[in-house]
């Protein structure tokens, strides 16, 4: 990320913090529950989400970028009402999980213009000032589309989409967006992978040229995917 920024690529880092949130909720004795890969978030949990995402994970990432020689600034979707959201009407069981209604790109563009790497914690806000937990993959897609980004890269803990999750050699290197529904219906995409795949699909449908799903655990995976002929993950195209 730092190298890309140093060679002139405008990089925006959008992050969640699912494991960290689950760990903190567990320490506080609050159970974690998920529906279709989305965390059910009650009034108590949304405070923990804000605390962990904006107060801990975000600052850890900003600090790490600084250690690597980059210049980053931490932002939360509430800042400048950057990520405007409302409650998901047809899924009341999710509680304070929001769907995005608008992205205000001004804070992001201002940070980029000043030479910073914006690091964005995905908490949204409604007209009444209520905070909402926003799925990070969904937020990344909406932000990429609003910025008219050329590429969006989703970092995961698997190689990409697989024909057989138990076979490392069954990677699907390229997926056309019209194939996504069939992949989900066929069970090749399930659980927490559904929001990731849908976010890549939506980004491409909304004008992002390419979306990538790659294994973030592989050293330099972003550079390999973007600057090699074969890549190492799954690329989504129209």
Predicted stretch roles:
Residues 1-217, 224-226, 230, 237-238:
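Nucleotide/pyrophosphate-binding catalytic subdomain
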């Amino acid at each position: 990320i730092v190298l890309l920024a140093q060679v002139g690529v405008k990089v925006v880092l959008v992050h969640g913090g699912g494991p960290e949130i689950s760990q903190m909720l567990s320490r506080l004795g609050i159970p974690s529950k998920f529906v279709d890969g989305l965390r059910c978030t009650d009034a108590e949990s949304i405070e923990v989400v804000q605390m962990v995402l904006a107060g801990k994970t975000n600052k850890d990432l900003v600090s790490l970028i600084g250690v690597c020689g980059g210049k980053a600034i931490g932002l939360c979707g509430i800042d400048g009402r950057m990520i405007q959201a409302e409650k998901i009407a047809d899924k009341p069981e999710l509680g304070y999980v929001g769907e995005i209604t608008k992205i205000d790109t001004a804070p992001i563009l201002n940070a980029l213009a000043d030479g910073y790497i914006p690091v964005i914690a995905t908490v949204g806000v409604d007209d009444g000032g209520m905070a909402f937990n926003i799925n990070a993959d969904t937020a990344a897609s909406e932000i990429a589309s609003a910025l008219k980004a050329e590429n969006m890269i989703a970092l995961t803990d698997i190689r990409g989409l697989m024909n057989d999750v138990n076979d490392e050699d069954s990677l699907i290197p390229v997926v056309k967006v019209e194939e996504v529904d069939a992949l989900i219906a066929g069970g090749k995409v399930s659980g927490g992978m559904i929001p990731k795949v849908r976010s890549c699909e939506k980004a491409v449908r909304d004008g992002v040229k390419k979306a990538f799903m790659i294994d973030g655990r592989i050293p330099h995976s972003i550079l390999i995917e973007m600057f090699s002929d074969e890549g190492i993950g799954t690329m989504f195209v129209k």
